[in-house]
Amino acid sequence: SAFSPVLVVGKKKELRQPVKIKAVNWHHKKRPVELQVGNFPPERYVLTPGINNIETSIPEVTAPCELPIILKEQGKAVSKINEKATPVKKWTVYLVQHTHTDIGYTKPQTEILSEHLRYIDYAIEYCEQTKDYTDDAKFRWTCESAWAVDEYLKNRPEEQVNKLKKYIAKGQIEVASMYFNMSEIVDESSFKTFLQPVKEFRKHGIPSTLAMQNDVNGIAWCLADYLPDLGIKYLWMGEHHYKSQVPFNMPTVFQWESPSGKPILTYRADHYNTGNFWGIEQGDIQKTEPKLLHYLSELERKHYPFDAVGIQYSGYFTDNSPPSIIECKLIREWNEKYAYPKLRSATASEFLDYITKRYGDKIPAYRAAYPDWWTDGFGSAARETAASRKTHSDMTAVEGLLSMAVLKDKCLPQTTHQRIEHIHESLLFYDEHTFGASESVSDPLCENSQVQWGEKSAYAWEAVKRTQMLYETSVGLLQGDLRRGKNPTLTIFNTLNWKRSEMLTVYIDFEVIPRNQFFEITDFQGHSLKVQPIRYRREGCYYAIFAEDIPPMGYKTFEIVFKQPSTDTGTITINNASIENHFYKLQLNPDKGTIQSLYDKELNCELVDSSSPWELGAFIYEKLGNRDQLAQYRLDDYNR
């Protein structure tokens, strides 16, 4: 359309809509012409040979209409077109500058922290540098991850910390509450460490009412319960669209309800670098304008319901980007040129405050999980990822054992709480979303790829090592109170709050149960547990034991009783490659090491799909012909 989707301020301070046309002068000399739009007074121009870009304006259009655009020469029309003019939506674009926090990716992890502390110093400087800018253009910055601010408070002098507090109080710097951008492998209990900085911030008088998750297309549902309890009003989700899909077809504000019904106002934003897709960091309106206006027109086409939109960008088009004031200058220049759309340098909460105030009664509510499928790098490190997940579970048990010790009036070692925090912090550093250096796919053996993986994996193994030692501490506190008998004893703990009967694996030295010695594990009433040896070491054996009725937040002690061998051979029969009991019949393929058949006798049902080209348990090695197909949600160039 010739009618530009912006509004400018006329000479009489009235709003006007620009009209832009291209006129071609085929003559070799200049031609004086008149341009008339609708019934508005004509304006005079001189066309030079070739293509001429002509820009005029008309009073603001308040309803859709079709207007003729006529080019006249010596009073006669030489060209005429009819163009549809529509009212310009009076947009405000809240531009939210942030630094996306990758622990690694652009540089090794050990270099990232010092950079992010420096960025907070820069942000303070830029607040000072833009103090005389118009309010819309003043530097504002949302600190995406609480980790950087938490470390800043520990590593900067009081004078510098006070400057940070000053600009937080003025609303130019905002501190988000979440430690990192998290994957889904972290468990619920670790979020107490994850959200711990909020408490520290409040000790310093620093408010935190926003949670921000970027570059991860989902988030743990338990946070919808936890965040409101901490006084956090808003959740901002900066998506990533590459080889993934996101909920909703446009930016969406909604009340996200937890399983218990607690709401938190949530914004599903577009990509966390959307402003950079427009080239905003280049500071050139001519480059940014068409992309920005196209974006807004697409929102209108999709019936976006608000007159404001929150857009994220970084100072430069990269992760772990330093902040910048280039964009502040562009915002100032834009607002001097256009009345609408209006650009505003803003914090994330400022945008959501506006939406809440103006549209609060029109915001939908959803009670549903918000799962992620973007942080798939963990699949490339099954060993370390399994170690992390197991350690989360182990820490639940260890903390339960320590709680039992406290309930028994045991005195915990002074360093216990520090050790717990260190373990959870190590797990968070492994579980946060960053996986691999930026060149880890194109050059997996380069120094940066190797160094970053070494540091990433070390977090998981550090947590494993320290958890095992903390387990020894907790058991050491309790072992003096455990029941003993004339025979060796085995105590099984249940650190959860319900009675449990489960199978567990126990390692027992040959000094306790000699090799080839027949035995039973019984309670003190003579009831035996089911026990099966799994694998042997030179000095002992691992046993599978089915423990029954272990009391909640308690334990049960059993005796190891030696006995003569039984003549009962059991009810399992093994014939060639077939294993069978009362419940199942399992047929193996010894050539492939797979399962051909698994028949459920109770259900009278075959559980293995015999029509599948791969048997159950088969190893499938798949190679992609190209990675680009992932971004297009298709899979047609591969071999298996």
Say what each PLM segment does:
Residues 417, 421, 429-640:
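Catalytic and substrate-binding regions of extracellular carbohydrate-active enzymes
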Residues 103, 134-139, 143-214, 262-271:
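Metal-dependent polysaccharide deacetylase catalytic core of the NodB/CE4 family, i.e.
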Residues 77-117, 138, 227, 575-588:
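An acidic-aromatic substrate-binding cleft motif
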Residues 92-94, 99-102, 250-481, 495, ...:
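Active-site and substrate-binding clefts of carbohydrate-active enzymes
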Residues 1-102, 110:
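Mature N-terminal, pre-catalytic/accessory segment of carbohydrate-active enzymes
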Residues 163-170, 220-283:
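Surface-exposed loop and adjacent secondary-structure segments within mature catalytic domains
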Residues 183-203, 275-300, 633-636:
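Alpha-helical scaffold elements lining the catalytic groove of polysaccharide deacetylases
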Residues 191-229, 294-313:
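CE4/NodB-like, metal-dependent polysaccharide N-deacetylase domain
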